[in-house]
Amino acid sequence: MTSVLDRFRLDGRTAILTGVGPGVGEHVAKAYAELGANVVISARSADRLERITAEINARNGGRAVAVTVDAGRREDLERLVETARDNFGPIHIVFNNAAAGIVYGKDGGGIWDNTDAVWKEALDVNLMATWRLAELTTADMQQHGKGSIISVESCGGFTPIPPAIAYGVSKAALLFAVRSLAKALAPHTRVNCLCVGSMSPDGQEAEIHRGLGLAERNAIKRFGAADEAVGAAILLAGDASSYTTGSTVFTEGGRVGTIA
């Protein structure tokens, strides 16, 4: 009989992750590798990718490769997929964590800081990256039948948080895209959202999040730690969620259900 814990293992599977840096992406990449997956991590910053890759390979026997990409550019995503296949073969898991287009309304700019350029970046990175990676990996997933695409959602996709309007609209559209892909790509590929709240923000982001009272507006009344999204990311990646698709798993401290 298969152990319950074995359903969470990812041995021999290959995972592509975007937006990997200090925070949720790094923790998820390390968790997938620890559970047996080959991981291909990507972000815009080569320096942080080198550090994370070295740490994974030192611990997990050389199952990580890094690729510097802009998730909003199709040609970069094509290169990411090609690199993953060249190193590890067919792709099983896509974890879409890259995000862009967040406007904080500095210096009184407010909603009009959502320029055409901001709108384009938000839609390209937050929405189209999921669509493009689904298209680019669907042949692999259709063949082996164990595909899992996970897109990181935001509380901003459920309720308006001005002035981050372009970001919120792109995340709301992502919800519909994920449900549509889940129906279209079943049964060989499952597609789900992971809604992540304010996870240990730092620097300017922390100041803004505190100013908005985001920690106080969720049920648990604190910011999350970056590793608190890992359990849900593991669940959605493998056989433990084999009957789950078109869904959203929430790791946001109860904020979506309680926000004013």
Q: Which residues are covered by each model-predicted region?
A:
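Conserved glycine-rich cofactor-binding loop
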Residues: 14, 19-23
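Short C-terminal tail/terminal secondary-structure segment
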Residues: 2-7, 159, 234, 245-260
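A glycine/serine/threonine-rich, flexible loop-to-helix segment
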Residues: 3-6, 54, 108-109, 193-218, ...
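Active-site helix of classical SDR
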Residues: 134, 170, 178
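Residue(s) in the substrate-gating loop at a strand-loop-helix junction
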Residues: 154
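Short, small/polar-rich loop/turn modules that mediate ligand/substrate recognition or access, typified
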Residues: 186-190, 244-246
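Substrate-binding pocket helix/loop in short-chain dehydrogenase/reductase
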Residues: 105-111, 115-120, 214
